[in-house]
Amino acid sequence: MDLSDFHISTPLRYFHEEASLLWKLGVFAVLVYFLLPKPTYKTNVKVPTVKYMGPWMPEILSRIFFNSHAPTVIYKGYEKFKTSAFKVVKPDGDLVVLSTRYAEELRQMPSTTLNALEATFTDHVGGYTTILTDSHLHTETIQKKLTPAIGRLIPRMISELDHAFEVEFPTCDDQFASINPYTVFLRLVARVGARIFIGDELCREEKWLQASIDYTKNIFLTIALMRPMPGFLHPIVGRILPSSRSLKDQLSYIQQDLLGPVIKERRRLEASSDSEYKKPDDFLQWMMDLAQNENESHPDNLSHRLLGITSMAVVHTSAMSMTHILYDLLTMPDLIEPLRDEIRNEIKDWNKATQADLSRLIIMDSFLKESQRLNPPGDLSFHRVVKKDLTLSDGLFLPKGTHICMAAGPISKDPDVVSDPDTFDAFRFVKQRTATSGFVSTGPNNMHFGLGRYACPGRFFAAFVIKLILSRFLMDYDFKFETEHKERPKNLLIGDKIVPNVATPILIKRRATKA
């Protein structure tokens, strides 16, 4: 299979190449809505429904308007019902948004009661984005193998990033050069992720890098285009949407031509009598070793899980975070020198940095958390599907099948929770230094990584990747917008999801003093 058949070349194309098709589908959806309004999942929970234009607004219009006005609806609901619960209606179903007063009660409930994987599947249009939800193998591998190994993995991460900085950035010793930051960060993260997740066999193979990056882009393009559609249209849209069709081709290519052969060869060597063979020390091998049954150990499913976890939990989220961070620095350049000073003081030699060195970057850690607070991945978090009828301690009844969540965005900008919430204070969490003030910390007032036993397990690894990239970038480059920007590039809103503008170019120039 020719990889170029499903290559998406630029971020601008990533978000806009199918706009014409989306517009036509949108018109079609509106027409069909009035004829056949059947959301995939509805709920009869007895809580107020919050609508964009008020309670008089017909439900059908509320569903149609949600994708373009989700923040207004969610913030309005939180303002009115932040100590109880409310419902929002989307094109494909209903969400019950619960107050954080339920957090302690819900956070440790088992997956047999509240299922996070099923909620992720629903929220990410899993039937059309190839998301697997039949096992916790990838989560278990992160928790048992990846996170405890971060300290010894950092030298490998540095080695790969050192190579990546040399090959991914243009020559710019004497003059500024233009780059698309999202594209560059995407490739940096993909490279370091590949080194840890699949080892030396494929990590620098362009065919793997491009396939995994394009797979990532197609997942989120498919989500962005399908979420505005009512659920009953998904089977039709999924068949004709180029990004959705490409995902299946990409997955098959990776299973059959890239990872599948690697898995089979590793198993052949394991079964051989070769006493010299030593198992690779990477995420793929850890999953192979932890797999408990035939389904988990099948090469196709191992390939699928590894691709999914790298694409969704490592590459996309880290590249998006890095792009947000860069825009914050470009619009608040007075923060650059304090960050550089801290890097100089705590990391004497970037190429020999340790986990302890990176953990001492408390100003950077606070800055990352503040950037995420004001530019989160979405306004809703703690998504769960209720697997059996559930009555909460105050009597609120949640029937089986209810999709619940919490308003992470409004919570992190609530003046009762955060002082002066509309101000970007890079030192906010340095001054707090509480148990939940760290970038990767979670709690009822800080849920952008989730909450409880199913909070994002890869956040620890991702945080060190981001700190390594940012520390090297800050010390090696000066940077500015390509044109005279006075404001931060506006985020793109896709329903309740928030992404940076990925089409804004910047100029970079190599500094005389490097990491």
Curated annotation (Swiss-Prot):
Gene Ontology biological-process annotations: paxilline biosynthetic process
Disruption of the gene: reported phenotype: Impairs the production of paxillines. Leads to the accumulation of the paspaline intermediate.
Pfam families to which the protein is assigned, alphabetical: p450
Major location category of this protein: membrane
CDD domains on file: CYP503A1-like
Topology in the lipid bilayer: Single-pass membrane protein
GO terms under cellular component: membrane
InterPro entries documented for this protein: Cyt_P450, Cyt_P450_E_grp-IV, Cyt_P450_sf
Cofactor list: heme
Keywords: Heme, Iron, Membrane, Metal-binding, Oxidoreductase, Transmembrane, Transmembrane helix
GO molecular function: heme binding; iron ion binding; monooxygenase activity; oxidoreductase activity, acting on paired donors, with incorporation or reduction of molecular oxygen
TM annotation in the entry: 20-36
SUPFAM superfamilies named in the record: Cytochrome P450
Chain's role: Cytochrome P450 monooxygenase; part of the ATM2 gene cluster that mediates the biosynthesis of paxilline, a mycotoxin that acts as an inhibitor of mammalian maxi-K channels. PaxG, the geranylgeranyl diphosphate (GGPP) synthase is proposed to catalyze the first step in paxilline biosynthesis. Condensation of indole-3-glycerol phosphate with GGPP by paxC then forms 3-geranylgeranylindole (3-GGI), followed by epoxidation and cyclization of this intermediate (by paxM and paxB) to form paspaline.
UniProt similarity note: Belongs to the cytochrome P450 family.
Protein name, entry field: Cytochrome P450 monooxygenase paxP
Native species: Penicillium paxilli
Gene designation per UniProt: paxP
